[in-house]
Amino acid sequence: MTRPFSLRLETGALGRLERLARRRGLPPATIGAAYVDEGTRTDLHPSVEFRSTPAGRTAYVRGTRLQVWMALDAIRDFGGVDKAARALRIPALLLAGAQNYGQEFPEEMAACREEGRRPLEDIARLVPNHCFLP
């Protein structure tokens, strides 16, 4: 559910937002709302950053190539944050932060997990001219 909210932006920031919105073919309010959402999530969960992917904006463990949902699966599969951190060779603090994010946004993690487990044929349509090994 959304609620209207008025916001004043500096002229330069508004111009950049409008340019980005035109490039993506979305209303500036949609892009702005996404940035506010991601910004508040990042401030509350500093171990997480957002990146653009063919499937849309996705939460990653900061400074790694690991999507948060993958980190959660690794924590489960290795039997805890410390064991997963040793296996993945990343700080346990980052994985613990990703775990906290996943606990706050379980529906998002479930959707990302489902998207990440799509057949390679589906992914090949999203990322044309890319070779996936069988």
Task: Map each language-model feature to its residues.
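Short, Lys/Arg-enriched anionic-surface-contact patches
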Residues: 1, 42-66
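Intrinsically disordered, low-complexity basic tails/linkers immediately adjacent to helix-turn-helix/homeobox/MYB/SANT
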Residues: 54-65, 113-134
